[in-house]
Design a protein with these regions (language model features):
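Glycoside hydrolase catalytic-domain context in secreted enzymes
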Residues: 1-254
Length: 256
């Protein structure tokens, strides 16, 4: 998998041990006598490979075209690079609402309009997933509308505003685009961590919208000092717990 938002975000270069008997997919990690190659460190007995990805326009710029057909073509271009670099899952697009112009990741998101956000995200999804083996992850589900204290902020929102503004774009993307996965957000929604919300993951996404793909947590969602512990994420309906607290699996998962 690879992150977004403006195309595929990969390490500029990686190395493969010249004498490795076997390597991981794409040779990102090659085996050495003392373990795997350290990324970002040059080694004498290794070949260096460079990865040049296209820097596509960011989400806000794309949305200003109001052109769903163009967004589908953009998605197809992303999928071509995914195939080239053996990436199966793109951790994008981000499609949170522009609630405040000071949000640190507004550039990544499409718009303050949930309809526009949803329709354009759906077009991108269709483009990417038109190629077999290429999938999309829409994020951050939901109400991730600021970067400052994003792991602890509580988004207090009425049911009507939640449905009509902050979830509407995701609903359209799910129903019109059928993404492979959804990534939950760090923040709380009305006092409950989004990744711990069964109402959000199971009732809304799966039962109401009919989503049948994978739901995953964001990286470091389950850090030790946070209230969003792994068993709560699993119980809420997250299928995949992304890396965070090293003791997650041993200490908590069985409690789900």
């Amino acid at each position: 998998m690879a992150d977004g938002p403006a195309g595929i975000r990969l390490r500029q270069w990686y190395e493969v041990d010249k004498e490795a008997d076997s390597i991981y997919e794409m040779g990102v990690l090659g085996s050495l006598e003392n373990g795997i190659l350290e990324p970002g460190v040059h080694h004498e007995n290794a070949d260096t490979y460079y990865q040049y990805c296209t820097a596509f326009p960011v989400g806000t710029a794309l949305a200003q075209t109001w052109n769903a057909d163009l967004m589908t073509e953009f998605g197809k271009a992303i999928a071509e690079e995914m195939e080239e670099f053996h990436v199966n899952l793109w951790l994008a697009p981000g499609m949170n609402i522009h609630r405040n112009p000071l949000c640190g990741r507004n550039y990544e998101y499409y718009s303050e309009d949930p309809y526009l956000s949803g329709m354009l995200a759906a077009a991108v999804i269709r483009g990417v997933q038109s190629k077999s083996g290429c999938g999309v992850t829409i994020k951050h589900f939901a109400c991730n509308n600021q970067e400052d204290n994003r792991m602890g902020v509580d988004s207090c929102v009425s049911e009507r505003a939640l449905r009509e503004i902050y979830l509407r774009g995701f609903e359209i993307a799910v129903k019109e685009g059928n993404p492979v996965s959804i990534m939950t957000s760090y923040n709380l929604i009305n006092g409950i961590h989004a990744a711990n919300s069964k109402d959000l993951c199971m009732t809304v996404a799966r039962k109401e919208w009919g989503f049948d793909g994978a739901i995953m947590s964001d990286w470091n969602t389950t850090v030790p000092e946070d209230g969003s512990v792994p068993w709560k994420c699993v119980a809420a309906g997250n299928d995949i717990i992304m890396p965070g607290n090293p003791d997650d699996c041993l200490l908590y998962t069985s409690d789900a």
